[in-house]
């Protein structure tokens, strides 16, 4: 008998992305862990999504769908014939409201409504009153298999635990010794009250005291070993998470970064600290505390069952309190992390552009925007703190009240000679241990919620689908003879392509000029040639072979794209030019001579060992652009694409660089807004309205046309 699949619920981010949430639920139901973030990149952020938009998203993933309009008054007869789960369109705002139907039962439907917090039931009559009669049926057979690199949260951490099982075992063992010795120490007061004092055993007092002091010393040694190993495990978890995260970041498509603020990517990584802390410390502590609660429970039951039952009551009350606050804290922590990401993004954006802020005298605007955003973060922090404090106060009320009640019940038994005073003090100590362990577990609630929300945000990046080069038949690109595009269309929305119907042939020694206004698709076309964007099959050919048949890393070695914002990091000029590759000094200097930056480098202190600041802020923009060009030339591309990358270089140096480009034995593509007078090209392409509206060609490569 097949195991029944668990129904998946995805909550919408905003009021208009219910359709994306429904798609995500269906994909996750079929073991494809794709969230709303990924789906947004497929279609773009809109104010609402039509049924056609949903069909387009499924189509982009290779999944077949069938839109249906059901007859009125025959809704449920028709629904019984449809493959579930499916997406239903209900009446709502402009684009309506989407829900996922999982089951149809006698009087109700089991659905995932993205506006709700979980899977819900909807009565048939309520459904019919809102139903628009439109259904989107999904062909299960066309749904692809689960991506190999997708990691479930639990599997990821189980794998870490398995690889560090010896450390985890020793941590658990030493923790048990620490707890056991701490509990054993409680017998000291029982011995004093019931044995030593009544019988005046002065000599035994010294012996027993030394034994218990030795136990304290041994406990401290075990505690040190335990703490050291927890730090070591934390280090390994941190290293594993950072490796997984940044290895994935380096494989993400370019539109992932274009559609997100810098602070969002950084904050998701920083959120990992909540996961690491909970996993490495709280997780182990929770296991020990659970063992301690069970062990002490047995001891208390065998010692005095009446007091045991008295202690059970606060445990039940505290557990109920934790359940009541669980969802409440989850929502507040999620809001807090989102607000932190927005504050970080805004701060990074302004700090990177303080020159503009100062030059326009807009510091007051910056402060106003920052305080407005940061105040939202502070309000979220305050809201979380209030919820945590309320929880702690109620826990304290229960614990302190029952501490008195336990002593009251125990004292009555001592007065009735049902129990000795030493036993009461011993039980009270054990009860304090038990309630303290329970308190630690329940206090993890906020940490657990933070770790849970952080793991969702963290694994949204880790599980983001990337361009896979798993095909064994992929070809290594060694040499580019020509590039051909056939009906090339690039864009998320088929109704509004960014680049549309591009047909051309470029040869190895061509010098190509592309001009056009901003937003006409020039950069998108250029990035597609180097496969920075996903390219449709049979639309770009390199040497007559589909670009998707080549390994994309080898493509980017041969085709180098440079934009107008040169990337320079904190380090020497030589380090920035080589970026991990090994070149001899002559090669480096020749590349710099070709890009007209050798002279100004020689005038710098330490020349090629001159230290650049972050983003090369101690150089002019024109100098940075020349360094970026030198780096590209140094890596010997066969196709060099310059997208406004010479825009800030002075005219004299620009003219010399154009002459160098003309002599280079490779395909040059220069993208500008205007026709440069000094650039010698043999092909010219004019972009307008996302198409090439004009192309001209000259056999004579020595002169501009």
Swiss-Prot record:
UniProt-annotated location(s): Cell membrane
Keywords, ordered alphabetically: Antibiotic biosynthesis, ATP-binding, Bacteriocin transport, Cell membrane, Hydrolase, Membrane, Nucleotide-binding, Protease, Protein transport, Thiol protease, Translocase, Transmembrane, Transmembrane helix, Transport
Amino acids binding ATP: 516-523
Gene Ontology cellular component list: plasma membrane
Record-annotated Peptidase C39 domain positions: 12-138
InterPro entries attached to this UniProt entry: AAA+_ATPase, ABC1_TM_dom, ABC1_TM_sf, ABC_transporter-like_ATP-bd, P-loop_NTPase, Peptidase_C39, Sigma_54_int_dom_ATP-bd_1, Type_1_exporter
Record-linked Gene3D superfamilies: ABC transporter type 1, transmembrane domain (1.20.1560.10), Cysteine proteinases (3.90.70.10), P-loop containing nucleotide triphosphate hydrolases (3.40.50.300)
Active site: 18
Domain (ABC transporter): residue spans on this chain: 483-705
EC id: 3.4.22.-, 7.-.-.-
Domain called ABC transmembrane type-1: residue spans: 168-450
GO molecular function per UniProt: ABC-type transporter activity; ATP binding; ATP hydrolysis activity; ATPase-coupled lipid transmembrane transporter activity; cysteine-type peptidase activity
TM regions (residue ranges): 167-187, 205-225, 281-301, 306-326, 388-408, 418-438
Any one of the GO BP annotations: transmembrane transport
Membrane topology, record value: Multi-pass membrane protein
Subunit composition and interactions: Homodimer.
Family in the record: Belongs to the ABC transporter superfamily. SunT family.
Function (record text): SunT (TC 3.A.1.112.4) is required for production of the lantibiotic sublancin-168, probably by both processing the signal peptide and exporting the resulting mature lantibiotic.
PANTHER family noted in UniProt: ATP-BINDING CASSETTE SUB-FAMILY B, ATP-BINDING CASSETTE SUB-FAMILY B MEMBER 6
Name of the protein in question: SPbeta prophage-derived sublancin-168-processing and transport ATP-binding protein SunT
Organism: Bacillus subtilis (strain 168)
Gene: sunT
């Amino acid at each position: 008998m097949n195991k029944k699949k668990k129904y998946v619920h995805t909550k919408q981010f905003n009021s208009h992305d219910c359709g994306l949430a429904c798609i995500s639920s269906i994909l996750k139901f079929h073991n494809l862990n794709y969230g709303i973030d990924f789906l947004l990149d497929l279609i773009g952020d809109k104010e609402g999504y039509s049924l056609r938009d949903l069909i387009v998203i499924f189509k982009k993933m290779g999944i077949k769908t069938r839109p249906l309009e059901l007859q009125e008054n025959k809704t449920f007869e028709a629904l019984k014939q449809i493959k579930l789960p499916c997406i239903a369109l209900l009446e709502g705002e402009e684009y309506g409201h989407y829900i996922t139907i999982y089951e149809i039962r006698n009087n109700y439907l089991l659905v995932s409504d993205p506006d709700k917090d979980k899977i819900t039931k909807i009565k048939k009559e309520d459904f019919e009153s809102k139903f628009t009669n439109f259904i989107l049926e999904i062909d299960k057979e066309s749904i692809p298999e689960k991506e190999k690199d997708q990691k479930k949260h639990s599997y990821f951490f189980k794998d870490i635990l398995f690889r560090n099982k010896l450390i985890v075992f020793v941590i658990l063992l030493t923790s048990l010794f620490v707890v056991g010795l701490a509990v054993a120490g409680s017998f000291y007061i029982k011995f004093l009250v019931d044995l030593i004092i009544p019988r005046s055993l002065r000599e035994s007092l010294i012996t027993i005291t030394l034994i218990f002091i030795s136990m304290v010393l041994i406990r401290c040694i075990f505690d040190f070993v335990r703490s050291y190993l927890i730090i070591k495990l934390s280090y390994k978890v941190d290293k594993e998470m950072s490796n997984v995260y940044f290895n994935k970041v380096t494989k993400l498509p370019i539109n992932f970064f274009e559609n997100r603020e810098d602070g969002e990517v950084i904050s998701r990584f920083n959120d990992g600290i909540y996961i690491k802390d909970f996993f490495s410390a709280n997780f182990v502590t929770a296991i020990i505390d659970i063992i301690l609660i069970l062990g002490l429970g047995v001891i208390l039951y065998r010692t005095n069952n009446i007091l045991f039952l008295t202690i059970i009551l606060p445990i039940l009350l505290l557990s109920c309190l934790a359940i009541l606050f669980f969802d409440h804290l989850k929502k507040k922590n999620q809001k807090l992390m989102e607000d932190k990401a927005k504050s970080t993004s805004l701060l990074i954006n302004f700090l990177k552009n303080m020159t503009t802020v100062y030059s326009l005298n807009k510091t007051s605007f910056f402060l106003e925007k920052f305080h407005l955003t940061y105040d939202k973060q502070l309000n979220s922090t305050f809201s979380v703190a209030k919820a945590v404090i309320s929880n702690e106060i109620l826990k304290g009320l229960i614990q302190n009240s029952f501490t008195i009640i336990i002593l009251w019940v125990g004292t009555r038994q001592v007065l009735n000679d049902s129990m000795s005073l030493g036993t009461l003090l011993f039980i009270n100590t054990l009860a304090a241990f038990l309630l303290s362990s329970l308190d630690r577990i329940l206090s993890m609630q906020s940490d657990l919620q933070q770790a849970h929300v952080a793991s969702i945000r963290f694994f949204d990046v880790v599980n983001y689908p990337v361009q896979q080069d798993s095909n064994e038949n992929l070809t290594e690109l060694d040499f580019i003879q020509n590039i051909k595009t056939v009906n090339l269309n690039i864009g998320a929305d088929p109704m509004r392509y960014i680049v549309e119907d591009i047909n051309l042939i470029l040869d190895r020694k061509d010098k190509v000029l592309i001009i056009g206004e901003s937003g006409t698709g020039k950069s998108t076309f250029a990035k597609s040639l180097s496969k920075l964007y996903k390219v449709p099959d049979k639309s770009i050919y390199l040497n007559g072979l589909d670009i998707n048949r080549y390994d994309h890393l080898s493509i980017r070695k041969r085709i180098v794209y440079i934009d107008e914002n040169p990337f320079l990091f904190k380090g020497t000029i030589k380090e920035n030019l080589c970026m991990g590759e090994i070149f001899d000094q002559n090669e480096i200097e020749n590349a710099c001579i070709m890009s007209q930056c050798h002279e100004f480098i020689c005038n710098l202190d330490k020349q090629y060992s001159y230290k650049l600041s972050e983003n090369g802020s101690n150089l002019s923009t024109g100098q940075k652009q020349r360094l970026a060009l030198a780096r590209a030339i140094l890596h010997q591309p066969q196709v060099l694409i310059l997208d406004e990358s010479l825009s800030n270089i002075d005219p004299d140096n620009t003219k010399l660089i154009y002459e160098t480009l003309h002599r280079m034995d490779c395909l040059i593509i220069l993208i500008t807004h205007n026709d440069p007078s000094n650039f010698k090209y043999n092909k010219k392409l004019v972009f307008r309205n996302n198409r090439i509206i004009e192309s001209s060609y000259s056999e004579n490569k020595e002169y501009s046309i």
